[in-house]
A protein has these predicted regions:
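Phosphate-coordination loops involved in phosphoryl transfer and adenosine-cofactor binding
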Residues: 21, 93-95
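Short beta-strand segments
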Residues: 27-29, 98-102, 141, 179-182
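Glycine-rich phosphate/diphosphate-binding loop of Rossmann-like nucleotide-binding domains
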Residues: 41, 45, 95-158
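Short, electropositive alpha-helical surface patch
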Residues: 41-57, 148-171
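Short, hydrophobic alpha-helical segments
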Residues: 82-86, 170
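Short, glycine-/small-residue-rich phosphate/pyrophosphate-handling segment
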Residues: 21-61, 67-82, 138
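Helix-loop-strand module that forms the ligand-binding subsite of alpha/beta enzymes
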Residues: 1-36, 181-183
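Glycine-rich phosphate-binding loop
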Residues: 1-9, 156-183
Length: 183
């Protein structure tokens, strides 16, 4: 990472990374002390400014048998980061989108309720697909099924909550495309 950050290409991997003109994703894995060194932090920031995508490390038991930050991201996290880069479309980038799904429950008393058969199973992949396309997704649901933490999810129960959160989310979404600040 440090060699790449200062442009040293003394092996095939670094030569390819420096010569490639597309998006490069980096999933760091190192000891906490290495990760927290100012030179490593500086080079990671420099690489991210230079249009390299840095996938966040995890805090857990490391190879050196100490607990701390520096473990490589889980394969599923790397998969989603790569998928998001490959699937993103300019039209959807930073565009606010509201997706709702799942059946609401109207309580009659402490034991009984009225509901419907809506599972929310279709809304989940729609929200995920829009996220992977680059949209800023607000997902309002009664049933969150294994979605990304990056998806802003509001869990609700009844139709009144659904209506209120939908109105608020739509009001915010109408403001248009998000402008993400540069470093």
């Amino acid at each position: 990472i440090n060699k790449l950050g200062i442009g040293i290409a003394d092996n095939l991997l670094l030569e390819c990374a420096l010569a490639y003109d597309g998006k490069v994703l980096i999933a760091p894995a190192m000891n906490t002390n290495m990760l927290k060194k100012s030179i490593t932090e500086r080079n990671l920031k420099l690489l991210s400014i230079s249009d390299y995508k840095i996938i966040k490390t995890q805090s857990k038991l490391l190879a050196c048998n100490s607990f701390g930050d520096g473990a490589m991201a889980e394969p599923i996290e790397i998969f989603y980061a790569v998928s998001k880069e490959l699937l993103k479309e300019e039209f959807w980038e930073n565009r606010r989108v509201v997706v709702s799904g799942g059946g609401t429950i109207e309580r009659i008393d402490d034991v009984r309720f009225i509901s419907n058969f809506s599972s929310g199973k279709m809304a989940n992949p729609i929200a995920l697909a829009l996220y992977l396309k680059g949209a800023d997704v607000c997902f309002i649901t009664t049933k969150k099924l294994n979605l990304r933490d990056e998806l802003y999810t509001i869990e609700i129960e009844n139709s009144k909550e659904m209506k209120n959160f939908l109105e608020d989310a739509l009001r915010v979404a109408k403001k248009g495309v998000l402008i993400k600040p540069n470093l």
